[in-house]
């Protein structure tokens, strides 16, 4: 029997376009209190950055086109209802590298969105979002709250 890694409330969604994925994230973010950590898990092209843009929109960010994957800068910071710390772990190889970024300084200071979260082990309370690609722009999105 396969053990479910989500020990809390888990919901599954199907989206059929980037817009639907964006709107799902936007709706989810409207209930945020300002200290959430969102771990985005999925392969290249799965929609992690689109989901991050939706979260930013849900938090009232005016120009979500600014939101881009921080693959080279590793962390982008955006202003919205709460500060948004957008982290990309694609290039990191081990847990200690995230500590070198000053990761812990951001905890509790705003919303933290982590792309490629599967690359590092996290021992903290977080919202896990797994994005799986289907045909065309279809996505299966599992959210563990």
Where in this protein do the model-derived segments appear?
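Short hydrophobic/aromatic beta-strand immediately N-terminal to the Walker A/P-loop
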Residues: 37-39
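N-terminal pre-Walker A segment at the start of P-loop NTPase domains
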Residues: 5-27
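Short phosphate-coordinating micro-motif centered on Lys-Gly-acidic
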Residues: 2-3, 11, 94-99, 104-145
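Short beta-strand-centered segment that lines the nucleotide-binding/catalytic pocket of NTP-utilizing
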Residues: 62-77
């Amino acid at each position: 029997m396969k053990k479910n890694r989500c020990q809390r409330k888990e919901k599954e969604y199907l989206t059929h376009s980037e817009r639907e994925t964006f709107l799902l994230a936007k709706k989810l973010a409207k209930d945020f209190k300002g200290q959430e950590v969102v771990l985005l898990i999925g392969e290249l092209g799965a929609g992690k950055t689109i989901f991050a843009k939706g979260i930013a929109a849900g938090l009232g960010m005016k120009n979500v086109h600014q939101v881009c994957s921080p693959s080279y800068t590793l962390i982008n910071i955006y202003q919205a209802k709460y500060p948004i710390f957008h982290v990309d772990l694609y290039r990191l190889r081990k847990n200690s590298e995230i500590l070198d970024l000053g990761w812990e300084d951001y905890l509790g200071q705003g919303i933290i969105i982590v792309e490629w979260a599967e690359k590092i082990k996290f021992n903290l309370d977080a919202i896990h979002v797994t994005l799986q690609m289907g045909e065309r722009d279809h996505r299966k999105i599992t959210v563990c709250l």
